[in-house]
Amino acid sequence: MANEPPTSTSAPLLSIIIAAYNDWAALTSCLRSFAQQTNPPSFEVILVDDGSAQPPPDFIRDWNNQYPLTIVRQPHAGVSAARNRGAQISKGPILVFADADSRFHVNCLEALAATIANFPQHNSFQLRLTGDCATLVGRVEELRLITLQDHLLQPDGCLRYLNTAGFAIRRTQVDVEAGVFYTGAVRGEDTLLLAGLIERGQLPFLVGNAIVQHETPFSLLESLRKEIRSAYLEMDTYKIIDSKGVKYRVTYRERLGMLRAMWKTSGRASIGRMAWFVLVTRQVLRLVLHFVYRASGAR
């Protein structure tokens, strides 16, 4: 069943697609951020409920009074399948993928639309992601995102990084009916999509003034558990990417450079050294898991 948006005589420029699974409270702030946009282009929001225990509550559906919001429910099939479903029912020429815990800054959609119009040679766009420095876990996320987006930025403005907390792509560049994302990827689906773009020589262009804050509503222990679980679930996806022969991993020299840059950035009062130690611990855990996985023969 769908909660249909108000009738429109023309397709919106942006179709914002969000997969949700039992996270209605976090989603509220995300949907509110769309209502607070200044001078936005025409847009619609497609919310795919991926088999949540309870249907979307009224306080979610009521955002349909602020902008076109379509809500569809499906049996639990994973985030990739949910995003594919959203893309298939969307109308806009630009597909924008976001997470339920993404918060779009007030001029984000305006900046994204301007960049898309000014750079027709680019087909995909990575929005600039930030963390919430109000908590330690948020400061760790801020440090991680600053480091990745600074060090993986190419001279032409493209980025060797893709994160679907805020990512856009032209509809003409994907097979919407076949699926934008590979549904066999439980985690790491955005990295698999990046590998496909690398194969085509089309890295996403970084839209530096289109800012999305990626919330991390976890305790420190919960974030470490999530990191371990994600690293484990991503391994099969990375095996698929490796089979393609696509070079996407950073080199050991790059890792050392990023480690030094992280230490320098953590000197900012808004981030702090503790964020550096936590982030390094997380990355060491991830590397150990990957080493064990490879040493075991990836069975």
Language model: regions and residue ranges:
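Acidic donor-binding segment of Leloir-type glycosyltransferases
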Residues: 31-73
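Short aromatic/hydrophobic "clamp" motif used to bind/position activated sugar donors
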Residues: 95
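Short, flexible, basic/aromatic active-site loop/helix in glycosyltransferases
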Residues: 127, 141-160
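Non-catalytic, C-terminal membrane-associated alpha-helical segments of glycosyltransferases
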Residues: 226-233, 244-299
